[in-house]
């Protein structure tokens, strides 16, 4: 551990103690030596005693900077780990930091381009359009076509700082698992590992550019979503150049109302976009908070979304997609037995789980929701409660499903903010039913067979030889099995004969011994003894030697 990491660790602990977060630790994590270290090395007074624990954690993470802010945002979606109060507080964390110097941004951009900015762009503005914890955005005009673009560039040394904080987080998580018995259930090390994968993905702007290109191609003919054009020739790990868009932030409800936006259509399109990305494309935007979503200014009666920041994208396996769709449909039909079966069949919960107990737990959670009108039932919270219930049955955490849950909560919250009467169930159910029909119906079967036809056409000439080889192998197996059976029968015969002789010899020996002690004819006991010895010798020698068949 370097001096810098020790210094950073001290600063993190000091900040957490300033907000009195040691007060919320369970007794298992505060033994006498912890209290001794707390009072001797960290004589910091808790200045926020009157504030709730969730608010104190939010303020501490805000002060600790970008890595902790993003961790807090991720944890806000893990209500299976945190209470609702704490999760709601963390959801309010904003990834807003002061911009870094425009001259440094210019230097970083030119290092990636290996050319002066003015040779490729006009009107480069050193004052950033937006600034976040990992990167900031500058505007310019492309020399080649005169179109407005934005240049997204990583902050200087951001990778080093993030790696150092991640290492510290990982060590802390392992310590928590060691000190706290419940740590194994909460799996803090696993949570930090999921976070590490997510945030390191955001540090590669070339990867983000490729994600944006793929998402754009998926919705080229869509009336619901527009993804700005990416200039791939100017994209590098630390730099991304894309078309500049002019929209209204989805959180600016007043501006959307002023232009006469059709909120009902906009909300329904948001739901359809989510399910299309997940079930049709298997490639969904997993960071759809209001800062990344804008609404078109043209045609407010027929509005569409503009999606930015494709650094975090999610995918599901075909198995996960099918089980998820069936899960939702089973919930629509209040089929709790099927929901429990699906969790076990999918491998999300151990196959050793008590199915009836799990079904009952799901029913206890879900049944009260049906006392509300359908348009008041939260789709995201249904999924959340199901995973929280499954947690008590040792659910295996699926990172891709955590991303899905987070995205669904964002989309649903956004849809109801735009149009409070949004009936998400009515919008989603036909889509899911149609998708399931497409997956298991005759057309789907024909499609799956047709995709395999080239493979089988290539293998068809080999069939006669394969059939002949299998028949030949079958004959060999039959012959081998017959030989084994013959050997086994021979062994059994020898064993029976040997056992018969040994038992007879034992009887003769016992009789001879008993007769010697009685007034029997002189020669009778000795004949029995000699005969018994001879039979024992013959029986012993006739035992089968080889037990391998």
Swiss-Prot record:
Example of a GO MF term: ATP binding
Active-site residue numbers: 287 (proton acceptor)
Metabolic or biological pathway: Cofactor biosynthesis; ubiquinone biosynthesis [regulation]
InterPro entries the UniProt entry points to: ABC1_dom, Kinase-like_dom_sf, UbiB, UbiB_bact, UbiB_kinase
Transmembrane keyword on record: yes
Annotated membrane topology: Multi-pass membrane protein
Example of a GO biological process term: ubiquinone biosynthetic process
Keyword Mitochondrion annotated: no
Binding site for ATP: 129-137, 152
Localization terms from the record: Cell inner membrane
Keywords: ATP-binding, Cell inner membrane, Cell membrane, Kinase, Membrane, Nucleotide-binding, Transferase, Transmembrane, Transmembrane helix, Ubiquinone biosynthesis
EC numbers for this chain: 2.7.-.-
Protein kinase domain: residues covered: 123-501
Enzyme class at the top of the EC tree: transferase
Membrane-spanning intervals of the chain: 496-516, 520-540
A GO CC term attached to the entry: plasma membrane
Role summary: Is probably a protein kinase regulator of UbiI activity which is involved in aerobic coenzyme Q (ubiquinone) biosynthesis.
Family: Belongs to the ABC1 family. UbiB subfamily.
Protein name: Probable protein kinase UbiB
